[in-house]
Amino acid sequence: MGKTSQKTITRLKRQVRVRKKVTGTAERPRLNVFRSANHIYAQLIDDVQGVTLAAASTCTEGVAQSGVHTGNKASAAAVGAAIARVALQKDIRSVVFDRNGFLYHGRIQALADAAREAGLDF
């Protein structure tokens, strides 16, 4: 079995600490972000009902482009704009941002800024 790196353990501790304070409702869902080496994913989650209201990622058809590297800030900004577009179609204007233990920097910040510019309020 492989060992979990100290960096991952620290991120998971931050995730638990943030998750204790942040919950999403139907009126103001939680905008959850997950970042991997090659992709970035965003979901709008209603924690009361336990359902995902909307999702977008660099794997989604409208966002992904063939032959383009998706592990960069430009792709993260495209995902932020896409999740905001889907949220506004479902009359969701205000969300709670859950960075999922990742530092608010780089691709996470680019996604959040693009979602704000596209009309989400958080």
From Swiss-Prot:
Recorded GO MF terms: 5S rRNA binding; structural constituent of ribosome
SUPFAM superfamilies: Translational machinery components
Keywords recorded for this protein, A-Z: Ribonucleoprotein, Ribosomal protein, RNA-binding, rRNA-binding
Disulfide bonds: none
Gene Ontology biological process terms in this record: translation
GO CC field: cytosolic large ribosomal subunit
HAMAP family on file: Ribosomal_uL18_B (MF_01337_B)
Job description of the protein: This is one of the proteins that bind and probably mediate the attachment of the 5S RNA into the large ribosomal subunit, where it forms part of the central protuberance.
Family in the record: Belongs to the universal ribosomal protein uL18 family.
Quaternary structure (record): Part of the 50S ribosomal subunit; part of the 5S rRNA/L5/L18/L25 subcomplex. Contacts the 5S and 23S rRNAs.
Protein name: Large ribosomal subunit protein uL18
Annotated source species: Trichlorobacter lovleyi (strain ATCC BAA-1151 / DSM 17278 / SZ)
